[in-house]
Amino acid sequence: MARFPKINLDITHRCTLQCRRCNRAIFAARGQKVPGEDMTIENFKKILDFFEEITFCGQISDPIFHPKFIDFLKLCKDKKVTIHTAASHKKEDWYKKAFEANTNAYWTFGIDGLPKDSHKYRINQDGEHLFKMACMASKIVKKVKWQYIVFNYNENNIEEARQMAKDNNLVFEVQKSSRFWEDDPLMPKNKEYYIERKNYENPTKV
């Protein structure tokens, strides 16, 4: 029997996105290599012995880029599993295999704005492709969530996105960010859509 309720894992160091508020941007600004490595299957199996719930939510990576990620999903079918992803650089057949590998999993897709606009923050993301994959997931896995962080370019599209989510059986979640500094060009105009942090400075300035 597992000894602890849950754990979040950052299982790789890879991501194809260049989100401007991600910790990866800080490493890049400082000319540093993103730390980390791919978790081994052996170490992952050890973790499964201790935890009931497994969350794959990378702080400096996207879990879909672990070369054995589908194998990881197969190994934890008897656990509660949640995947957070925002990268889109996988083909449709890969996503289908991933969804089918663990149909009890919960998937959260980070699409910040209407799918055609999400790349304005999530640089290199194909939001329209990712939205299609989220819609596919909703027909295969247990639960699919559309996570929508509010920025100035998408704050007026929330209700349209909410309806899109409803039409495609996606749970819609609006998130307020606290990673804005004074005169930040991405900060929403409506103060209800962000969390203010006093004296917060641009961490990518070196």
Question: Which residues fall in each region the model found?
Answer:
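Conserved alpha-helical substructure of the radical SAM core
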Residues: 1-106, 120-128, 132, 168, ...
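Conserved C-terminal portion of the radical SAM core fold
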Residues: 50-57, 80-82, 103-111, 128-205
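Glycine-centered loop/turn positions within well-structured domains
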Residues: 17, 116, 144
